[in-house]
């Protein structure tokens, strides 16, 4: 390497005189080809090896060696470089620590390598790849002060050009972050609802239904129960109260129509709805509390012209009331609502049907059992209690006969007499039973049947063996079978007529 090249590579510009600061470091001798740089101090050598390097000469030169670190000249002196070269020392200082470490390691590898001129050109291309073509001739070498952050006026002018790539990188990062924040987070757990790909919020039908149910639960109020507890008003209270108002309005409309001699059909129209609400399970208490029984008594009450309501209404209501769920209506409810009085009126009304009278009688008997403290479970009733009950329902004539027989029998034990039902064999023959069928002088005649006054409380045992297969289909001849048999008979007759009759005279012979 020539002396001119050594001088050109060894000289490094100092900071401008305007800065007024001098570098405390001693200049470093230029590095010759194949020799390590010599410095008076080992610390200074380490600093330059880690933090800065001098870029190779401009591409116009044919042969050049790797650049040696520039040494700071004494204060007040500045030696210009024949070919200014752009470096990245300021970009390295302003960048992050991670990028500084990576770039400094790459630069040390380029400085310390002993490569040929061709390799030097490749390194120049790698170092100058971030610069434009027109910036190659206006580059400056860094000084010692620039390495430690002392900026001159010239450096301030060149800062936008040197940090162009870094600014673009930072702006790109900002744009990516803004795009990420603007995108909807589909996988986020904090989303209130589902979001479609266009960013529009929508709500499923199932979510709407759950929201409505939740709103209904919030509207529920609490009240004091009969037993002192707290009962929650269910959803049926509003429905039943509105139904009761409509039932009363329908009954009033029918009464007005009856007065005006017009057809009354408002209650008939509401009958299916009333039937549906009475068939629901667990709704008896709600019906009682909302005055349903009083509205029902208005439906069963006679019209102003003393005629009974429609037959369909009477049959449906009585059958629904004869359900065990309505047997436990207390006395106060029946008296306050007037339902007991309405059912008793139907039982005693002469125009009421026999079936409805029977249902009304049973219903009144069930409602009267708690009043007389009677048990509804017949399995717990003893034999003596059943006999006493049968005796109480026995006709007066038969009671007299039983009492007359008991008086004739001596009572040795001096026990209190009690009514006892005897069998037919124990009772002596009467005038009507002197002669039996088959006896001499017995006159067969018709007898008026009398209803039995006994209560059959013991269910007979089932003695039928085998499963019931249901009613068998009739095996009678249908129309198809009869037609088929007629056809077969006609064909038989036709076949018999086809038989050739032999003639003695030889007639009708196909010879």
Swiss-Prot record:
Amino acid composition bias (Acidic residues), ranges on this chain: 94-103, 166-179
Highest taxon, organism lineage: Eukaryota
Bias (Low complexity) ranges: 11-30, 55-86
Keyword Lipid metabolism listed: no
Residues of the signal peptide: none
Regions of compositional bias (Basic and acidic residues) in chain numbering: 134-143, 383-395, 414-425
Keywords, comma-separated and alphabetical: Nucleus
Positions of region (Disordered): 1-200, 382-454
Location(s), subcellular: Nucleus
Domain TFIIS N-terminal: 294-374
Keyword Nucleus on entry: yes
GO CC annotations on file: nucleus
Family named by the database record: Belongs to the IWS1 family.
Name the UniProt record assigns to this protein: IWS1-like protein
Organism: Caenorhabditis elegans
Higher taxonomy: Eukaryota, Metazoa, Ecdysozoa, Nematoda, Chromadorea
